[in-house]
Amino acid sequence: LDYYWDDVPSDKQKEIFQQQVDLAKKHQKPIIIHTIEQFLISTNIDEIVVAVPQNWISYTEDIINRYCKDKKIHVIQGGATRNETIMNVCNYIQNISPNEENIVVTHDAVRPFITQRIIKENIEMCKEYGAADTVIPATDTIVHAKYGQFISDIPVRSEMYQGQTPQTFKVNEFINVYNSLSEGEKTILTDATKVYVMREKKVALVEGESYNIKITTKYDLKMANL
């Protein structure tokens, strides 16, 4: 699980973190706890690694110990980006449990409505194809505007999907593929699965759920009714 999103500015991430604090003060479970609980009950998950910014580690450990303390939960420092964070997690996993067959199921800490089906199917697809991404079909027409002013293209909607998480990878393969990228290639990454796409590797699709939302605003929190 991670608190890093390449598409969420740092000031918004601070606001999201403050939501966790405010919920705890109201004696309500922080969003991340709801998320962790879904992975704790999964029979397919051996260890849970929560990656957060350095200055969030102490608080994250405190709320985990308060609500769902478990020896399989580990809190570590993430990286400067989503993909660097995944690399930190992958390296941590290989240090505590070296295994060529290790799989990492990466998930946004603020997507608490993850289902057991989605977790299970991510792992199954990853075992078969090497990587998996959770998506839902696009319901609106997608417009491509290369320079943000005029329409460049309108893709066929039936071929378009909206990305969610989890995104799931074989640990060693992710490390190898990511390390094969140049620094220039790494700077343009906006999504973990693009690491694979850039190296023309298959990423299998897993059907998500419309309610598997990322809670990043007060409106999202109200709609989630947590």
Model-found features: residue ranges?
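Residue-level signal for inorganic ion chemistry
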Residues: 24, 32, 89, 108, ...
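Divalent metal-binding pocket/active-site signature
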Residues: 1-33
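Conserved core of the sugar-phosphate nucleotidyltransferase
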Residues: 100, 113-206
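Hydrophobic packing residues within well-ordered alpha-helices of enzyme cores
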Residues: 60-64, 122, 224
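Short beta-strand-to-loop acidic/aromatic patch adjacent to the donor-nucleotide binding site
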Residues: 98-110
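Conserved N-terminal catalytic core of the sugar/cofactor nucleotidyltransferase
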Residues: 32-101, 181-184
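Structural beta-sheet core signal
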Residues: 49-50, 106, 131-134
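Hydrophobic helical membrane-anchoring modules
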Residues: 212-226
